């Protein structure tokens, strides 16, 4: 069974798959935050036009940008998301029992739902603020 037959979210448990996301990563050789080390710390590369070095933990979904060549990915991950369960896994993912893996993935899924819920709440609050302003402007016209 190859990695391609795994669901996309589960493919991210494989370090090589995470490494493959680091296209056009600005820090390659002679740096602490190489693609290999970033992937080992759980990060995937998800650049934007304004944030070419944006990396996100596939597990806790913490996003970090503004990397410096001497930044240690594991230490940065611990500093900004110390509760990430990925950081405490002692086995290679290929060595986990099915029960261990599913328990771990349940935590990842909870993190994903929390992140998506938080994003939707922010989006709703921004929309509500715009609507409130529009209503106030209409009321001022009367």
From Swiss-Prot:
GO terms for biological process: apoptotic process; cell division; chromosome segregation; establishment of chromosome localization; G2/M transition of mitotic cell cycle; meiosis I; mitotic cytokinesis; mitotic spindle assembly checkpoint signaling. Pfam families: BIR (PF00653). Its main location: cytoplasm. One of its GO terms (molecular function) is zinc ion binding. Keywords: Acetylation, Apoptosis, Cell cycle, Cell division, Centromere, Chromosome, Chromosome partition, Cytoplasm, Cytoskeleton, Kinetochore, Metal-binding, Microtubule, Mitosis, Nucleus, Phosphoprotein, Protease inhibitor, Repressor, Thiol protease inhibitor, Transcription, Transcription regulation, Ubl conjugation, Zinc. Ubiquitinated by the Cul9-RING ubiquitin-protein ligase complex, leading to its degradation. Ubiquitination is required for centrosomal targeting. Deubiquitinated by USP35 or USP38; leading to stabilization. Acetylation at Lys-129 results in its homodimerization, while deacetylation promotes the formation of monomers which heterodimerize with XPO1/CRM1 which facilitates its nuclear export. The acetylated form represses STAT3 transactivation. The dynamic equilibrium between its acetylation and deacetylation at Lys-129 determines its interaction with XPO1/CRM1, its subsequent subcellular localization, and its ability to inhibit STAT3 transactivation. BIR repeats lie at residues 18-88. It is found in: Cytoplasm; Nucleus; Chromosome; Chromosome, Centromere. GO terms for cellular component: centriole; chromosome passenger complex; chromosome, centromeric region; cytoplasm; cytoplasmic microtubule; cytosol; interphase microtubule organizing center; kinetochore. Gene3D superfamilies: Inhibitor Of Apoptosis Protein (2mihbC-IAP-1), Chain A. The modification N6-acetyllysine is found at residues 23, 90, 110, 112, 115, 129. The modification Phosphoserine is found at residue 20. It comes from the Eukaryota. Zn(2+) binds at residues 57, 60, 77, 84. The record marks 126 as: Interaction with FBXL7. PANTHER family: BACULOVIRAL IAP REPEAT-CONTAINING PROTEIN 5, DETERIN. Multitasking protein that has dual roles in promoting cell proliferation and preventing apoptosis. Component of a chromosome passage protein complex (CPC) which is essential for chromosome alignment and segregation during mitosis and cytokinesis. Acts as an important regulator of the localization of this complex; directs CPC movement to different locations from the inner centromere during prometaphase to midbody during cytokinesis and participates in the organization of the center spindle by associating with polymerized microtubules. Monomer or homodimer. Exists as a homodimer in the apo state and as a monomer in the CPC-bound state. The monomer protects cells against apoptosis more efficiently than the dimer. Only the dimeric form is capable of enhancing tubulin stability in cells. When phosphorylated, interacts with LAMTOR5/HBXIP; the resulting complex binds pro-CASP9, as well as active CASP9, but much less efficiently. The BIR repeat is necessary and sufficient for LAMTOR5 binding. Belongs to the IAP family. This is Baculoviral IAP repeat-containing protein 5. It comes from Bos taurus.
